[in-house]
Amino acid sequence: MTSKSLTHLVFGVLFGCLFLQTAMAQISIGGKPYSFALRTHTMSPPPVLMPGINIGKLEAEDLLDEQAGLAPRFGDLIEVSLNTNNSGVWETLPDGGRLWRLSIMAAGAKSINLLYDDFYLPDGGVLYIYSADRKHVIGGFTSANNKADRIFATGLVYSDHIVLEYYEPAEVIAKRAANNVAEEASISINYVVHGYRFIEFNPNDLVKAFGSSGSCNVNTICSQGDNWRDQIKSVVMLLSGGSRFCTGYLVNNTAQDCRPLLLTANHCLGTADAISSPSVNTWTFMWRYESPNCTPNTDGPTNMTTSGGTVLANPGSPGSIFSSDFALIELAENPKTAGYDVYFAGFDATTTAPSSATGIHHPSGDVKKISMENAALTGTSYGNTSGTATHWRVADWDSGTTEPGSSGSPIFSDATKRAMGFLSGGGAACGNDLPDWYGSLGYSWTNGGASDSRRRLNAHLDPGGLATFVDGSANPCNVTPPA
């Protein structure tokens, strides 16, 4: 039995078609790089060339990853040491400001995204990243993106040649000098991700791209989603470790305090772990990636993203699909306070099986889909029809299916509209009647009696010991918790 983490590979769908306009990634201020406004076009510095990649080797590794139940991969991590001190070019501007630019080329890449081991911007400084032809821009990133551990990640730029541009106004430099404070920017890149899966849809290519999920999948905008409009807004596509993707969902808690908690699958974590390695500040989360049409399938918006988080709880054995395969993450950037139209899904830790259920997910990195099971779920161990009820078994989908990339997505009780689990894996696909298994939120509540709060969900989803369930809310900040 394999997890929903590979088979019909491709990340292409993740960020859709390339538009000839500025786009933003993570929480950012938008706008355009400083150099774009200069009267005379200034040449970018010569690019730092990345080594070539071995596609055959990567595809062989991808097959092994599938067997191991890892999340699907779209890019190859290239280790580097590029920063504002050892790379790029600084120049002083006529107004006294400063500009730093670094050019990176990964020949043949479908996209490039970056991971940072030290990222800090002073107030007033702004960073943009753009394709060398200036057709795709992300940013601007500011001090609002600084993290306590100074780890950061930026989203995909659809080109094999990108430019980083950091602008520091004269007043920022003057303030630093006047206060005698060494508040210098630090932009240190430790990984360049060479995207080797197609991103733009080309019907003549055999490699799948946008619209790559099976034809039986149903867009959430279709009538099947009419009773689930709120819950649909809770589901998010995530980039784990900068080079793989899964699905997750924003979840409410009994304190109803707008805390940005996200549930996904443990096997999506890679080496991250609540105890030994809790930071996932290299992760990126894409909200509201949904088709505006039922049919034909149309790409959705890709500009609502946040980055970073901390693993609060998982069952241990990083990357394992067994136990109940849960992972709870606290997001570093709250999509609600960023102004995104999101929903905090309700949950239910009951061990009583729902009589019917609905799943919402991003199959093969595609726009959001909805799947329906009209029969009762059963509590079983993973991959079985009986055993310790660590999982909910979906016998076969009556509408839609799940695929690689759907891992970590929620399954909701039709009766209560509360989430009851997160997808681990299974054999379901268009054209078959094979089962799927979702990690049970009820089992994960105590995780078989785990003593450490980092190995169970109840300490975080019910911090006051109030209840084992809560309804969803678009704005739980203003809701009075149950007595």
Region spans (language model):
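Serine endopeptidase catalytic core focused on the charge-relay Asp
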Residues: V157-A395, P404
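A short aromatic-anchored loop/beta-hairpin motif
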Residues: I27-G96, W100-M105, R197, F201, ...
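Short, surface-exposed beta-strand/strand-loop-strand elements in extracellular ectodomains
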Residues: Y120-H136
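Beta-sandwich interaction modules
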Residues: S103-I104, D133-H161, Y167-I173
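Extracellular and analogous surface-interaction loops
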Residues: E91-D95, W100-K110, F119, T154-L156, ...
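Sec/Tat signal peptide C-region and signal peptidase I cleavage site
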Residues: F19-A25
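Catalytic nucleophile loop of clan PA
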Residues: Y249-P260, G400-L423
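C-terminal subregion of chymotrypsin/trypsin-like serine protease catalytic domains
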Residues: L261-L262, I275-S277, P292-T306, G319, ...
